[in-house]
């Protein structure tokens, strides 16, 4: 399997997912969120089973793209169902905290379970794992989850769907391409084209409202500073969080030499911090203004990265402790920001609003890889010193990434290997320090901005019902 095939296998899912989140959110409002959840779960389980036995790289790319379609059904449906079931503010926040904890637990357990499966079974077992997880959902959801939908849905607008799909695909492809090859003509042109289609989508929504035609997405929501502040806080925090996981996983596996399974286990305390902080803040947030809570959570982000920038990633204990502080900030900020986002819209539009939230998460994930990951890689390449006498091909490989340096060192051995690893580890740590300092400043600024954007929210956020 060539490198290009591997890239498409990885990227096809996120490309399709990001393109379809907003349309699927609107479809859920129209046909029913529970129905969309069941369709998405059934399709995701079925395609996962097929992907496990894909006979070629092309078929695996197609399977991953199909998983993106059904994944786009699942993500906004779950959050919008919470919006419609839980009216009481405290109960809704607890439900959101549990919902967010599921994603966090999945992110932490993924490397552990995936590493175990790949160590003992064929690669297809990773896809098969989704099947037994989704079967209980398919059995229990029709019994336990009530149906909800928009009683007056907007008419289907194929042009709006095409515009948002094309726009998000262009932006996501361009950013993903940037993380792999840098800002070249392809990346710049696709990002700009994507932004143009997004502008056309917004103009069409405004035009439909002007002509008293219900739009697919009420873009006027972004005039609400509380809604926009919550969405922006989620996007930026996700960007730096992904950046942390990006270099933490490399440190644990490449510098410390831990297998993926054990590296993932060291991240469990931080994941538990996310879960506990979310559940606790859901109950005590009633005593504080939402702006104070979100800003405090983002400030914890800034503090964690500031300490990491000062100390550097010299040992595993630093990584673990930093992730605990960071996880606490994640649990606090994202639980309340998601509640603010959901409460800012009427129940009938919960699907579309949830899709915007999920899109911000996906965009933040890509930006984390591009910006934080790109910064880390650039600093590494500027500081790593390759020993003299090394084969040119091997030298280039070692100069590209830390993983490349570790691979080359294992091949050459001896004093050259020791010199290369020493230089590579120092260069990588320099990248961690700079990217952490950047993240600390960014989150400090975001903590202040989010406070002023969200402070207009009432102390006890009541769901919009109009």
Residue ranges, per PLM feature:
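Interfacial helix-cap and linker-helix signal at transmembrane-aqueous boundaries
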Residues: 27-28, 113-121, 175, 252-253, ...
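Hydrophobic transmembrane-helix bundles of small-molecule transporters
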Residues: 97, 119-233, 240, 258, ...
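Helix-loop-helix hairpins in multi-pass membrane proteins, especially solute transporters
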Residues: 26-159
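Residue-level signature of the transmembrane alpha-helical cores
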Residues: 39-43, 47, 63, 70, ...
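Hydrophobic transmembrane architecture of multi-pass small-molecule transporters
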Residues: 136, 340, 361-455, 460, ...
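Loop-to-transmembrane helix entry/capping segments in MFS-fold secondary transporters
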Residues: 89-99, 260, 347-356
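Structural signature of transmembrane alpha-helices in multi-pass secondary transporters
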Residues: 13, 17, 68, 97-107, ...
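Transmembrane core module of solute transporters
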Residues: 4, 8-16, 122, 159, ...
């Amino acid at each position: 399997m060539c490198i290009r095939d591997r890239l498409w296998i990885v990227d096809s899912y996120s490309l399709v997912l990001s393109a379809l989140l907003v349309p699927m959110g609107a479809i859920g409002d129209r046909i029913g969120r529970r129905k969309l959840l069941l369709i998405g779960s059934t399709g995701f389980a079925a395609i996962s089973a097929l992907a496990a036995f894909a006979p070629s790289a092309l078929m695996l790319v197609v399977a991953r793209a199909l998983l993106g379609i059904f994944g786009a059904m699942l993500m906004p449906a779950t959050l919008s169902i919470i919006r419609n079931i839980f009216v009481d503010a405290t109960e809704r926040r607890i439900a959101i905290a549990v919902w967010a904890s599921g994603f966090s637990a999945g992110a932490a357990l993924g490397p552990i379970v995936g590493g175990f499966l790949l160590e003992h079974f064929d690669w297809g077992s990773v896809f098969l794992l989704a099947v037994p997880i989704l079967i209980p959902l398919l059995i229990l959801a029709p019994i336990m989850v009530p149906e909800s939908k928009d009683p007056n849905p907007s008419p289907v607008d194929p042009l709006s769907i095409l515009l948002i799909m094309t726009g998000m695909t262009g932006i996501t492809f361009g950013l993903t391409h940037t993380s792999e090859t840098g800002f070249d003509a392809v990346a710049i042109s696709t990002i700009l084209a994507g932004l143009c289609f997004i502008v056309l989508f917004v103009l069409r929504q405004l035009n439909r409202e002007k002509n008293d035609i219900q739009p697919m997405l009420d873009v006027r929501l972004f005039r609400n500073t509380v809604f926009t502040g919550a969405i922006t806080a989620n996007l930026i925090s996700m960007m730096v969080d992904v950046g942390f996981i990006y270099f933490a996983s490399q440190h644990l596996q490449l510098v410390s030499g831990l297998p993926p399974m054990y590296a993932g286990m060291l991240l469990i305390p931080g994941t538990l911090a996310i879960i506990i902080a979310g559940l606790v803040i859901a109950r005590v947030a009633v005593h504080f203004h939402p702006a104070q809570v979100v800003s405090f959570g983002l400030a914890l982000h800034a503090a964690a990265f500031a300490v990491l920038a000062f100390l550097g990633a010299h040992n595993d204990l630093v990584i673990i402790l930093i992730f605990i502080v960071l996880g606490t900030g994640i649990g606090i900020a994202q639980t309340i920001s998601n509640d603010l986002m959901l409460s800012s819209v009427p129940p009938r539009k919960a699907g579309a609003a949830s899709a915007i939230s999920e899109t911000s998460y996906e965009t933040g994930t890509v930006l984390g890889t591009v910006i934080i990951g790109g910064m880390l890689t650039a600093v590494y390449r500027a500081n790593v010193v390759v020993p003299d006498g090394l084969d040119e091909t091997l030298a280039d490989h070692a100069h590209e990434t830390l993983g490349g340096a570790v691979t080359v060192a294992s091949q050459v051995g001896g004093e050259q290997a020791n010199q290369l690893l020493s230089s590579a580890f120092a260069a990588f740590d320099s990248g961690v320090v700079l990217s952490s300092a950047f993240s600390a400043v960014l989150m400090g600024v975001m903590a202040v901005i989010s406070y002023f954007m969200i402070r207009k929210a009432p102390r006890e956020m009541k769901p919009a019902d109009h």
